[in-house]
A protein has these predicted regions:
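Beta-propeller blade termini
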Residues: 77-89, 137-146
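Short aromatic loop motif centered on NTY/YTY
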Residues: 120-175, 181-184
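Short, solvent-exposed loop/turn segments at conserved positions within beta-propeller repeat blades
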Residues: 56-59, 104-108, 161-168
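Short glycine/acidic-enriched loop and turn motifs that connect beta-strands
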Residues: 100-104, 155-158
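Acidic/hydrophobic-patterned starts of short beta strands in beta-sheet-rich repeat architectures
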Residues: 88-99, 145-151
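Short, surface-exposed beta-strand/strand-loop-strand elements in extracellular ectodomains
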Residues: 109-117
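Terminal domain-start segments
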Residues: 2-87, 177, 183-184
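His-enriched metal-coordination microenvironments in redox/metal-binding proteins
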Residues: 101-106, 130-132
Length: 184
């Protein structure tokens, strides 16, 4: 009987230790995530759909995580390029940008926030930043509440889109109710 009690106690303690260890695993690092496009699920702008990224593509000497979405009627195909080079991580949050291209001439840039849960990434929200801009830096400036600063260049009033973006801008967004809200 004494051996049975000891065995039951060992099983209970072992289960508790296992449960505690699995609950407190550290988030996956950006270095690991940069090589695992399938971990990234992204909400496709202007739709209710989301896609998993599927491959890594070299653009302008840097790796981008890539995925494609086709509308149900097959009329439009959107390609998403997630910029892992500018991704920043603070605890369970990751902020980065991605670019969408489709059959039109625009190249649309979004700021995106992900949250890690048990080594899975959830795309909390995306916000449109601009068309054919140049994102220079993304930084998490506060963790509670989450605040993200984005520095980029956009086109001036008289600058054609065929020329490089030339007007510097900075914006700070706060995550409120899983939405990015512009602060300044």
């Amino acid at each position: 009987m004494k051996q049975w009690i000891i065995l039951v106690i060992v099983i209970i303690l072992g289960t508790g230790v296992f449960y505690t260890v699995t609950r407190t695993e550290p988030p996956i690092t950006l270095k690991e995530l940069a090589t695992q496009p399938q971990q990234w699920q992204i909400k496709v702008p202007d739709t209710t759909a989301s896609i998993h990224l599927t491959s890594i593509k070299q653009l302008q000497q840097h790796p981008y995580l890539m995925g494609e979405y086709q509308t149900p009627d097959g009329a439009d195909n959107t390609t998403i390029y997630l910029d892992i080079n500018q991704a920043v991580q603070q605890g369970k949050y990751i902020a980065t940008s991605f670019v969408t291209t489709n059959s039109g001439s625009g190249t649309f840039y979004y700021l995106s926030v992900f949250e890690q849960h048990n080594k899975k990434l959830e795309n909390l929200t995306n916000v449109f930043i601009g068309d054919r801009i140049n994102i220079e830096k993304i930084a998490i400036v506060n963790n509670n509440p989450l605040m993200i600063k984005i520095d980029y260049k956009t086109h001036g009033e008289n600058t054609p889109y065929a020329l490089p973006a030339d007007v510097a801008k900075s914006q700070i967004y706060q995550l409120k109710n899983n939405q990015l809200v512009l602060q300044q």
